[in-house]
Amino acid sequence: MHAPEASPPDGGLAVSTILWFWLPLAATWLMMAAEGPYVAAIIARMPDAAFNLAAYGVAFSLAWLVESPIMMLLTASNALVSDRPSFLALRRFTYRMNAAVTAVMVVAILPPVFRGITGSLMGLPPEVARLVHAATAILVPWPAAIGYRRFYQGIMVRHGQARRVAYGTVLRLATMSITAATLALASPLHGASIGAAALASGVIVEAVASRVMARKAVAALPVPAPGAAAPLTQRAIVRFYYPLALTSIISLVTGPLLTFFMGRSRHPIESLAVLPVVQSLVFLFRSGGVAFQEVGVALIGRSGEHRREVAHALRLLAWGASIVLAGVLFTPLAHVWFQRVSGLPSDLADFALLPARILVLLPAMEYWLSYQRSRFILSGQTRVITAATALEVGGIALVLAACIGWLGMIGAVAGSLAQISGRLASNLFLFTASRSTRAPGTDTNG
């Protein structure tokens, strides 16, 4: 495996090097977390805000569902692109995936199909459905642009150029701002369409920028001698990648599950009202953990030569994230966040406290999960990751059913208990699996 620039070729890997490698990736996830609220804030300041916010939310959800199978292309290129032939093989696979998701988007906006989705299936009012159709049409190139971008981002991460990934995200947000402002001032488009156009243009510009920024890394890929190693085949890529794609799709079930059960719980309105606020706060501290998966893939090494250093950095970041979150949730800062920052009235701020406090260990568990996943990715055992994700979602469903259906708990509290329980099941499953396999780093942190 080609060693990233952030990793010294010999000896140990300094924890400070790992942290500097991780920092721009974490910043990228933080900026991406801000993207949704940012677009929503733009739409909220335009005419017919309620209809357009609803329409944008539906259009984004549809596009996100279509896009989910290509989310792991960054991980795939980080793990698999070691030379020129593997680059060409995975690029061919990426193009095919992009063509497939674009075809699905095109089919989805065909009038008969779209009416079936938004009318028969979702029951949207006609005025909202029309706005959704226009916004979804604008988002047709969005999934493929994300796939293209993530393919080249993975190559940059592998070569120790994680900062360039963050630069691309900044460029995307700037493009979104310019597009939204220009269209709001000089076009007749509705807010939902302007939000979709801002989102699509930002990702397209970032995709082009990622290709340009990855140019030197691609040029540096070695050409192996004939017969030096077996080439990376399309069949091998599919075998490696389809469990990762399935993992992304399964993960999407969590949100609807929480919403479904909370709507049937005690205090459903209050639970649904505080859910996005609590989740947003916790994700601020989880986002660095999501980014840590790419750190593990890039730096642990194919044979696990840097596993101890990466595990040490993992412990520092994981416990640090949960301790800082606890410092917010178990002090007066909690009310400052929920009331002054998030704008919740005092009764809902009080209501949000217990569900949020239950999730205090979720950031640490996110880091642990990313570290565990990275080791299985390096060994090519991606099916184990899919099984762990399915177990997590199944655990969430079972705990929700038990807490709400049998114990009559408040929905928000049950939701937090379910998320912690599901994640713990996933962590423990991967811990157990690592003990019986040869994933890199099995002797450290499970």
Regions found by a protein language model. Give the residues of each.
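Alpha-helical transmembrane segments of multi-pass membrane transporters/permeases
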Residues: 91, 155-182, 292, 307-318, ...
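Short membrane-interface helical motifs at transmembrane helix boundaries
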Residues: 103-133, 324-353
